[in-house]
């Protein structure tokens, strides 16, 4: 049986060693399954693979039934923010380190991907985050995130003081190195290493995690994602806000960072029988060494 997906876009971690040969191998495999293959424009330019049509994110959104991301979670985050608005489903083939959201190993991708192309898959939808920086009543920066929005102190400065509001209600003033607002997807990233809990992807919530707080009673808290979280810069030098650790806004005193749930979702496709708990067990090495 041929693929149910006619037009497939390939997006690669082109900086990685061996990425060109991996992408060529996958493209040939997709062609043998009856797919018409296009390469994302930066991937094509940086790998020298010129034998396939090239598309930007908007072109992928308009012309492709499926996007195949070959790389690590960072590669997925970068293209995911651009593709979510188009509703194109995404499959991740891992060539990175951890691979929470690029969960198909390259070494056995053909056996895993072939049934998925025939329609045998699990779909997993994740809400995006929409953020903006407001200065003197005017929006000076906008960004979308899949994992997290992080407010950080400057590299050579002391702690920042942050005023936190949820749905217009004052929560607390926090003195810390920073603060993370993470989605369920991002709860296994920076937020986890800062001591936050893991949120199951089905939970319509965020986790608010302080980074090295001055007060030990300042603990992570789980919030609904249906409202608005606002972080105001009260004190501290050279603060910044990052979005999935890939775009950055420089902040001034009085700036307010507003975070809401986006109207867009990422559509992840996983192999049939996929389980979030299988992913946690594998990636976090649970049960290893247990008799």
From Swiss-Prot:
Involved in the regulation of the intracellular balance of NAD and NADP, and is a key enzyme in the biosynthesis of NADP. Catalyzes specifically the phosphorylation on 2'-hydroxyl of the adenosine moiety of NAD to yield NADP. It comes from Polaromonas naphthalenivorans (strain CJ2). It is found in: Cytoplasm. Its EC number is 2.7.1.23. It holds the Pfam family NAD_kinase_C. Belongs to the NAD kinase family. The gene is nadK. The active site is at 73 (proton acceptor). One of its GO terms (biological process) is NAD metabolic process. GO terms for molecular function: ATP binding; metal ion binding; NAD binding; NAD+ kinase activity. This is NAD kinase.
